[in-house]
Regions:
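Membrane-embedded segments
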Residues: 1-71, 75-79
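A generic structural signal for ordered secondary structure
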Residues: 9, 67, 177, 226-227
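Short, surface-exposed linear patches
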Residues: 30-34, 61-64, 91-95, 216-220
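Anion (oxyanion) recognition and catalysis
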Residues: 33, 188, 223
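Hydrophobic anchor at the start of a short beta-strand
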Residues: 39, 194, 229
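Serine-dependent acyl-ester chemistry module
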Residues: 75-219, 232-238
Length: 239
């Protein structure tokens, strides 16, 4: 069972997976190369806390062993967790909406038919009706896609109810932290340490503050739970 034993397992979404780079160039690959530790990259695009819990539960039941799990909580996790996913009593992930079903289809295409998925992406973007007027672009300020704005706005919006979200932001925060608490208890029962890491999106650098709601909620959550809390917001705000 040597191939099922790891010092550290990294959990997260596409940022952790390193979707646009080779494994060696991902931060997990760089960490493994520099530390020589036996690590597993468990990150996959569009993952969020409900899937973190489900995946770890599955891996532990399959006999995988870890000394520590490090979870890179993404800004989009709150939206994805509340909008797309549900969990049953067996900790199995299901779809939470019609959009959720589309997300599962995209993940299947990406994993099993990468070229088909790529060409669908290209065709979709080529057929967009809206034309971009390059003369009207303000090159001194960043331009963000509406989906990215929607998923990131909760950390700096003063509203508790935001159009496009299911339920209130505060209620979704509580649900997400409850899911993460379940994950913590599952790991603790197996003698596995848990650490969390947070990092900003470009939208946070433009509209949010260094001591973001994302930082405060997870730093508070980590009290008496985490081995380490890694806050990467200061590094990005300084640069």
């Amino acid at each position: 069972k040597a191939d099922k034993e790891f010092e550290i397992g990294f959990l997260g979404d596409s940022f952790t997976e390193g979707a646009s780079v080779t494994y060696e160039d991902s931060f997990v690959g760089i960490f493994k190369s520099s530390t020589k530790k036996d690590v597993a990259n468990l990150g996959v695009v569009s993952y969020s806390p409900k899937i973190y819990l489900s995946k770890i539960n599955y891996l532990l039941n399959e006999g995988y062993k870890f000394n520590q799990i490090v979870i890179f909580i993404d800004i989009s996790d709150l939206y994805d967790d509340s909008f797309y996913y549900s969990l049953n009593d067996k900790l199995e992930v299901g779809e939470n909406s019609k959009r959720g079903k589309k997300l599962f289809i995209r993940r299947i295409l990406r994993s099993n038919f990468p070229f088909t998925n790529f060409y669908m992406y290209v065709l979709k973007n080529l057929n967009k009706k809206e034309e971009v007027d390059l003369k009207k672009i303000n090159y001194t300020r960043p331009t963000f896609h509406k989906d990215a704005i929607l998923k990131s706005i909760w950390t700096y919006s003063e509203k508790d109810f935001i159009k496009g979200y299911f339920g209130s932001i505060s209620e979704n925060q509580k649900k997400m932290m409850n899911t993460m608490d379940e994950l913590y208890k599952l790991l603790e029962k197996k003698g596995i340490e848990m650490s969390l890491a947070v990092y900003p999106w470009p939208q946070q650098l433009e509209y949010d503050v260094e001591n973001s709601e994302q930082v405060k909620m997870w730093e508070n959550f980590c009290t008496d739970r985490c081995k380490h809390f890694f806050n990467f917001f200061p590094y990005f705000f300084e640069s």
